[in-house]
Structures are given as C-alpha cells and as structure tokens.
Amino acid sequence: MSESVANRAVVFYNNKSLPIISSEELNLDSCYSSSEVVIRVHAAALNPVDFLLQSFAYSWLVGRGPKTFSRDYSGEVVRAGANVKDFKVGDKVSGLFQHLYGKQGTLCDYLILDPVKQPAISKLAAAGHAEYDDYVVNAAWPLVFGTAYQGLTNFGQKLGPDSKILVIGASTSVSNAFVQIAKNHLKVGTVVGICSKKSFDYNKKLGYDYLAAYDDGSVVDSVKDIIGKNLNNEKFDLIFDSVGNSDFFGCINDVLKDKGQNSQFVSLTGDKKMNYSSPRIWDSLPGLESLKRYGPFRKYNYNLFMLRSDSAFMKLGYEMISEKQYMPAIDSVYSFDDYAKAFERVKSNRSKGKVVIKIH
C-alpha cells in the first residue's frame, strides 16, 4: 500500500501577491525517479535573494503558477531511487537546492532532488551548538559558506600566509563564513574587515586581524591607516565586498595590488547596497565605473559573481563544522507557521546571522 502525505510549502504567485501556505498530497512511493531522493525537510534558512526575486516576479515575466522560497535545507532521506549511489534512506543531510522561480523550494515538508543535478548536498555535520540542534545549524550554512568559498577560490588566486584581504561588510553571514575559511582553512596571514564600531569585539573573535569602522570618520582613511601602520604599506591581494560599496574605486591603486599580480576585487551585489524590503532593479545595474573594469578600459581585476552549485564547498563545510573550525551565525529560529515573522526579520536588515525556519 502506497504512502501519501501532505506536502506544505510557502508560495507566492507574483510580486503583488502575499506569500501563503499551500498544501498538496504527495505519494512518497511514486513521486521520485530512480536517480532521485526524497528528503523530509527539518529546517530551511532564508536568504535576501528570496525577496529580491519575489520583488522582480512580474506575472508577464515569470508566469502565473506558484513559486517557492529558500534554497538551504537540512533533513532526512525518506526515499532513495535505485540508481542513487551516495545516499540512502535514513541518512541525515543538508545542502543547497538551486532554483529560479521553481515550483520546488526548501521551505516545504518534502524536497525531491537528483544529487547529481543538485550536487551541493552532504551528510549532516555534528555541530555541537550550545543552543541549536544540528538540523538548525546545518540549514544555516550552505549558501553563505559556498559563496564565501567560491569568492576565495574561483579566480585563480593562491591565498595563504603572505596574503592580505580586505572584507567590506565584515558582519554579514557570507563574510562570517569567509573569514573563518580564510583563517582556519587557507591560513591567510592578514584579513581586515569593515563593520560598525559596535561590532568590533564580535568580529575580532571570528579572526579578523584589523577592523575599520564605517560609522566613525572616513572608512577609506581608516583602511589606508591600517595599510600604512600595520601592513608595512603592502596593499591587498583581494578585496571582497559582500554588501555593495563604491568607496574605494576612486583610490583603488592605493589599496589593491596591481592587476598584473592577479589581485582581485570580488563583489556579490555590485556598487550599491540593496534594500531588500523594497529593491529597485536599477540599483543592481552597472554604472560608469564599470567601464574601468572591462576591455581596454580595465584598470583592475573585477568580478561580480553568483554562487554555483558544487559538492566541493559542501565537503569542506562538513569537515570544518565537524572539526570545530567553522560555525555559522544564527540570528533567530521561527516555526513554519510563523514564516511571515521570519520574512520580516530578514527584510529588516537588522538580523545578525541567518534566519532559520524549523519545519519538523
């Protein structure tokens, strides 16, 4: 006799509709192929990109069907196809499910995926967190950890003890992962962070060697002072911007090594900080400064990138959590029924770490 269950999901239809909980019957014995697994989702994390995409979901562009939220997940495999090699029923897993306006997201009861096509999946790491269980912790890290890892490794740089990195937006969840990977895995010699003055103590504990405040005088002058007084006038090999900033472009040659040394400016969002509660599409468009980044006008190596699904960062994240070398920052945890409160917390821009929704 086949087993049918209710599969709830938080969905929206377009940028004018409010998110709602929908439910449909799912036959656990016939809903998957021989190459797929069915995961009972225990926890899912929210990311600002969820609300950015919702804001741009015009009906004429994305259609009228239901769209879903979230990409990070943790849970338990309850069905596995005959051709699935690395996962079996009973395995506890976490991962990143990539989709764009998909009918399936991770803010649901059950997730069906092919581990070959969605390779960012691993066994659940034993976190040993003092406050949160392993499902909550493991839902909080895949997207931000993967983004940080690829920002450090995707552009041909050999970073290590002699390297110097500047992180713009030191307190974000991505930068939280970034500094822990840089210091604990790559053994980068010097990481300088930019954050609010009140966040200095917290970020120092994560591993930043020096910090500059964006809310206490000129942040550009503060960074230049650090270069002169603490770095022996050596410029940065990598500037990593996780928030959207243009402060340093006017003096890029004073802070970033020559492009011939494969120095890189890596950005996640472009030149402007995005307001995720009411984003504007033109805020993400390149400005005149972009002419200095490409073709014959290129003055420095610049990369605006998005995370690609990959098993490599999941393997490393699992190892680092298990070895107590990385712990994601968690701001708050909400129940599935309180998803609206969780959404507002993310859109407030006041969360200090990941917002996680506990489903089971």
Swiss-Prot record:
It comes from Lachancea thermotolerans (strain ATCC 56472 / CBS 6340 / NRRL Y-8284) (Yeast). It is found in: Lipid droplet; Mitochondrion. SUPFAM superfamilies: GroES-like (SSF50129), NAD(P)-binding Rossmann-fold domains (SSF51735). InterPro entries: ADH-like_N, GroES-like_sf, NAD(P)-bd_dom_sf, PKS_ER, YIM1/Zinc_Alcohol_DH_Fams. Its main location: other. It comes from the Eukaryota. This is Protein YIM1-1. One of its GO terms (molecular function) is oxidoreductase activity. Belongs to the YIM1 family. Keywords: Lipid droplet, Mitochondrion. Pfam families: ADH_N (PF08240), ADH_zinc_N_2 (PF13602). GO terms for cellular component: lipid droplet; mitochondrion.
